[in-house]
Regions:
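A cross-kingdom feature strongest in bacterial/archaeal respiratory oxidoreductases
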Residues: 17, 189, 194-196, 210-247, ...
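Generic detection of long, well-ordered alpha-helical segments
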Residues: 12, 111, 151-162, 237, ...
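A glycine-rich dinucleotide-binding beta-alpha-beta segment and adjacent secondary-structure elements
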Residues: 117-120, 143-230
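A glycine-rich phosphate-binding loop feature that marks nucleotide/adenosyl-phosphate handling sites
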Residues: 48-49, 179-189, 263-268
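FAD cofactor-binding and catalytic pocket of flavoenzymes
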Residues: 15-143, 150, 193, 214-215, ...
Length: 268
């Protein structure tokens, strides 16, 4: 069958687990657009300053944007509830019919980032997707696609996040919003793509070892979020930093490596 690594032939020894066990932090991205006359101006706040745990495995982080981030409005539409790729678009159409004024207000881009509060809804649950390289439909080369893990699929809707957004919208008179792709295609969006070259015991279970060294190769390390094997359920920046620091602590200083090479050359 087709192997997405074959066209480059650059890494023939890399594990077949490459692209498998991709994590999204089990995430859903929502927003609330506050009314124009609100006293609270989120754009003047620190970008990420607070978060809450609605359950032991569900964490909501609140994000604000500066006054120059209005382009992000194009990612959002009216929030809809749970459903499928068939029912969620229908629910969106119903919401547009029931709330035409809110829909028209949501289309106004100017000032969106000054009044918007984003909700990053993250979970530490064991779910995943996979990256798959496939031949292009037209022309040569490959294209990257994603697919759900058949045993532990990634959620397309998180009820706690929707309830939190609805709560804030009701109390402020704002507009609860979800990502357009989620509302129209039942596909969630993540700000934290992780995994795909995860840590494992061997090449059959992962792409890198516990020191982030790629199985089958010498002096090739993976030191970013793609090595993370699980959903932390929170912003992963510090976890990625810690894993990278651990990997770097196993790399000998350049002087020691030079001495080792000279000794090896002398003994041979």
């Amino acid at each position: 069958g087709f192997d997405g690594r074959q066209p480059t032939k650059q890494s023939p020894l890399i594990s077949d687990r490459l692209g498998s066990l991709v994590r999204t932090n089990s995430e859903s991205v929502l927003a609330v657009k506050l009314p124009a006359n609100t006293e609270w101006q989120p754009a003047h706040d620190v970008a990420i300053s607070s978060s809450i745990h609605t359950s032991p495995d569900t964490h909501i982080e609140f994000v604000t944007y500066g006054p120059k981030g209005d382009v992000l409005f194009s990612l959002f539409t009216l929030m809809v509830g749970d459903g499928t790729r068939i029912t969620r678009p229908l629910k969106l159409i119903a919401a547009l019919v029931r709330h035409p004024l809110k829909f028209l207000q949501s289309l106004w881009p100017f000032g969106w980032s000054r009044r918007a509060v984003a909700f990053l809804v993250m979970q530490s649950l064991d779910n995943a997707i996979a990256f798959r390289a496939k031949p292009r439909i037209f022309g040569t080369g490959i294209r990257m696609t994603t697919e759900q893990d058949p045993e532990k699929p990634n959620p397309t809707y998180i009820d706690a996040g929707n309830k939190a957004a609805e709560w804030l919208a009701q109390r402020t008179g704002g507009i609860a919003q979800s990502i357009i792709l989620e509302a129209l295609a039942n596909i969630p969006t993540t700000a934290h793509i992780l995994g795909g070259a995860v840590i494992g015991h061997d090449a059959a279970s992962g792409v890198v070892d516990r020191h982030n060294r790629v199985f089958g190769y010498r002096n090739l390390l993976v030191c970013d979020g793609s090595a993370m094997p699980a959903n932390p359920g929170v912003n992963p920046s510090l976890t990625i930093t810690a894993i990278t620091e651990h990997a770097m602590s196993q790399v000998a200083p350049a002087v020691e490596r030079k001495v080792e090479r000279e000794v090896e050359a002398w003994t041979h």
